[in-house]
Amino acid sequence: MQHFMPASLIAILALAVPAHAQSGGAGHDSAYVRVFDNCTSYQAEDEPVHFSDCAGYGDWTVHIVAGEHGAAVAYSQRGKVTQWGQNPPRAAVFQDLGQVMEWRLDASGAPFATIYRSIFTGYERGDGGQYLTVAALRPDGEVGACHVAYIEAAQQPNANQIARDAADYLAPGWQCGIEEPIVFDLDSEMDVLTIAAQRRPGH
C-alpha cells in the first residue's frame, strides 16, 4: 500500500470511464469512477503538499490536497477550504484514498452524493482502519459539497450498503454548514433509516 508521500501521489491517482451499478433507494443508481486518472497536479511551494484537480462524474471536478500523512477531498471550485476541513475519524497516522469513488445518481441521472474510502495504516501491524465518507453534492450552493456520514468499513460487513443508504436518505436534505456528519459504526444506537425517518417533517 502506498501512502500519500509527494513522490507517490500521482502514481496512485486513476480515473476511468464510469460504470453503472445497482439501484438503491428511491430509484437511485450508482456510477463508479477510479480515483483519479484525468488530473492536473501541482505542489505547494516550500511544503510537501500536493494539489490535484481531477475530472469527476459529468461536469464535476474533484479536488485533492495530499501531504505526507493524509489527504482531503473537495468538489467543484466553491468552498474548497471549507470542504478540506471535513475528514473521517482518523484511525491511524497514514491515510490513503481508495481507488474507486461511487457517485449516487437520481432518477434523471444527475449525481447528488459521492462515497469514497479512506484507508488508514500505522507503524505497527494491526494499526489502522477504514471509513467510507458520504458527501452531499450542492451544485448551486456556496460550498460545492459537504460530508454527511462516516461509515466504519473495516468491521462492518454491510458498510457499502450503509453508505448508500446514507447517500440516498440523508444527503438530499442535508444542511451543509449547519449539520455535523454522523458516524455509523458497531456502537451506533440508530441506523440510517431510523435517523432518516426522524428527520421527516412532522417527526
PLM region descriptions:
Residues E152-H203:
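C-terminal partner/receptor-binding element of secreted or periplasmic proteins
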Residues A7-A16:
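Bacterial N-terminal signal peptides
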Residues H3-F4, V17-N87:
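Charge-rich, low-complexity N-terminal segments
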Residues R34, V49, G141, Y169-A171:
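Disulfide-bonded cysteine motifs in exported proteins
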Residues Y42, Y57, A149-Y150, E179:
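General secretory precursor processing signal
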Residues P88-P157:
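Short helix/strand-capping turn motifs
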Residues A16-P18, Q198-R199:
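Short alpha-helix boundary/capping motifs
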